[in-house]
Swiss-Prot record:
<feature type="binding site">
    <location>
        <position position="110"/>
    </location>
    <ligand>
        <name>substrate</name>
    </ligand>
</feature>
<comment type="pathway">
    <text>Amino-acid degradation; L-arginine degradation via AST pathway; L-glutamate and succinate from L-arginine: step 2/5.</text>
</comment>
<dbReference type="GO" id="GO:0009015">
    <property type="term" value="F:N-succinylarginine dihydrolase activity"/>
</dbReference>
<feature type="binding site">
    <location>
        <position position="214"/>
    </location>
    <ligand>
        <name>substrate</name>
    </ligand>
</feature>
<feature type="binding site">
    <location>
        <position position="252"/>
    </location>
    <ligand>
        <name>substrate</name>
    </ligand>
</feature>
<feature type="binding site">
    <location>
        <begin position="137"/>
        <end position="138"/>
    </location>
    <ligand>
        <name>substrate</name>
    </ligand>
</feature>
<feature type="binding site">
    <location>
        <position position="365"/>
    </location>
    <ligand>
        <name>substrate</name>
    </ligand>
</feature>
<protein>
    <recommendedName>
        <fullName>N-succinylarginine dihydrolase</fullName>
        <ecNumber>3.5.3.23</ecNumber>
    </recommendedName>
</protein>
<feature type="active site">
    <location>
        <position position="250"/>
    </location>
</feature>
<dbReference type="Pfam" id="PF04996">
    <property type="entry name" value="AstB"/>
</dbReference>
<feature type="active site" description="Nucleophile">
    <location>
        <position position="371"/>
    </location>
</feature>
<dbReference type="GO" id="GO:0019545">
    <property type="term" value="P:arginine catabolic process to succinate"/>
</dbReference>
<feature type="binding site">
    <location>
        <begin position="19"/>
        <end position="28"/>
    </location>
    <ligand>
        <name>substrate</name>
    </ligand>
</feature>
<keyword id="KW-0056">Arginine metabolism</keyword>
<dbReference type="GO" id="GO:0019544">
    <property type="term" value="P:arginine catabolic process to glutamate"/>
</dbReference>
<comment type="similarity">
    <text>Belongs to the succinylarginine dihydrolase family.</text>
</comment>
<feature type="active site">
    <location>
        <position position="174"/>
    </location>
</feature>
Length: 448
């Protein structure tokens, strides 16, 4: 049966700012307090979506969250009218206002974990919203994320939605950023690869010392159970704690997989040989031929991998079966990374082409091409059941660019977040967006 991988990119929200909220994310920390350009950020993301659509890839869009999140501030004790809540938070607890304004939902790789119908017990596509409980600014996303996903994938015949796991550190879940699926073809049963940073309940597992491990083994196992995955179709691997301490806060900063190929750094995992062996044997059991492409430390250091976001790239299968790697501009600007990529594409391995995109506004907050997209493998009838309002087309692209031009600022500082007019601008924009994308009422301000 014909099936496709569809990428749903996050539309950058109108409050995109550099709050430096993500401890363990080097770019986020180092660009804290810089002036952001929400209009440019949204257009850079839309340009990538259009370019991939023009290349023949299936492309969709995922709506941003309502920000500032006044309801979250109310839960923290701020009272009064909505503008009064924002003014009081700005006066008494600016870091909380900054967190409530974060546009981090643009990184839809963290929205949820997706298992395609070929892998699940009930032959439906399963979604589990990620609790993102490691960071306050992201932990408030999942209720709206769930509503948006249900509006996009509404058919109960084809799609199953699970709420986020319990919001405690033992079940810390960062979604698809720590999940990859290998398969011979998208419509056939595959092997789902879950990467975790630590175990919550077994102290024998090592853990990083400097930065937090955001994903637990127990969270990954729970998602696999919820999705009805068989043991033959799942591999768990522990991320190398040493690279977490070097700024590799998600697996998608040090590895990317697609089809039968895993592109990874030499230091990405613990027990690498065992992990690769299990992936190879389980994929062979499902008719596939696993190919591992290892980038050695001698070619690209972990530091350069993190600076350039070499692995936070999109690995896409072209019509002829070869693969395309979509990387940020920062890869071209890093001598050792670019030298490696030129050698990689000149060889006779599976990755034959590299495409470079300018995603500077997202990159400065620590999110590259892979962060910005959620992959969903869909069979023909499932694709037909997706809400057509979120499927990218030339008409939708142009409409969204015009919408951004109409509603977004081209300069946003931390002080601007306290502007009561910003709240009105954002709600006006999102109200219009839900009509453009045919989502219905998904935002708290639309539901009161």
């Amino acid at each position: 049966m014909t099936a496709y991988e569809m990428n749903f990119d996050g539309l950058v929200g109108p409050t995109h700012n550099y709050g430096g909220l993500s401890y363990g994310n080097v770019a986020s920390q180092s660009n804290s307090q810089a002036i952001s350009n929400p209009k440019e950020a949204a257009k850079q993301g839309l340009a990538k979506m259009k370019a991939l659509m023009d290349m023949g890839f299936k492309q969709g869009v995922l709506a941003p969250q309502e920000r500032p999140d006044v309801a979250a501030l109310r839960r923290l004790g701020f009272t009064g009218s909505d503008p009064e809540v924002i003014a009081r938070a700005a006066r008494e607890a600016m870091p909380l206002l900054v967190a409530s304004c974060s546009a981090s939902s643009m990184w839809t790789a963290n929205a949820c974990t997706v298992s395609p119908s070929a892998d699940t017990a009930d032959a439906r596509v399963h979604f589990t919203a990620a609790n993102l409980n490691c960071k306050f600014h992201r932990s408030i996303e999942h209720p709206t994320t769930s509503r948006v996903l249900q509006a996009m994938f509404a058919s109960q015949e084809h799609f199953a939605h699970h709420p986020a796991l319990p919001a405690v550190s033992q079940f810390g879940d960062e979604g698809a950023a720590n999940h990859t699926r290998f398969c011979k073809s998208y419509g056939e049963p595959g092997v789902e690869f879950f990467v975790y940073g630590r175990s919550a309940f077994d102290s024998r597992y090592p853990a990083p010392a400097r930065y937090p491990a955001r994903q637990t083994l127990e969270a990954s196992q729970a998602v696999a159970r919820l999705h009805g995955l068989s043991e033959e179709g799942v591999v768990y691997a522990q991320q190398n704690p040493a690279v977490i301490d070097q700024g590799v806060f998600h697996n998608d900063v040090i590895a990317v997989g697609n089809g039968e190929v895993l592109f990874y750094h030499q230091d990405a995992f613990l027990d690498t040989d065992k992990v690769l062996g299990e992936l190879g044997s389980k994929l062979a059991g499902r008719g596939g031929n696993f190919q591992a492409v290892c980038v050695p430390n001698s070619a690209v250091s972990v530091e350069d991998a993190v600076k350039s976001y070499l692995f936070n790239s999109q690995l896409l299968t072209r019509a002829d079966g070869s693969m395309l790697l979509v990387v940020p501009e920062e890869c071209r600007n890093n001598a050792s990374v670019w030298r490696y990529l030129e050698q990689l594409t000149a060889g006779n391995g599976p990755i034959r082409e590299v495409r470079v995109f300018d995603l500077k506004q997202s990159m400065q907050n620590g999110g590259g091409p892979a962060c910005l997209r959620l992959r969903v493998a869909l069979k023909e009838q499932e694709l037909a059941a997706v809400n057509p309002g979120v499927v990218m087309s030339l008409e939708l692209h142009d409409r969204l660019v015009a919408w951004v031009d109409k509603h977004y600022r081209d300069r946003l500082s931390e002080a601007d977040l306290a502007d009561p007019q910003l709240l009105i601008e954002c709600r006006t924009a999102l109200d219009e967006l839900t009509q453009i994308l045919k989502l219905g009422s998904v935002y708290p301000f639309q539901m009161t």
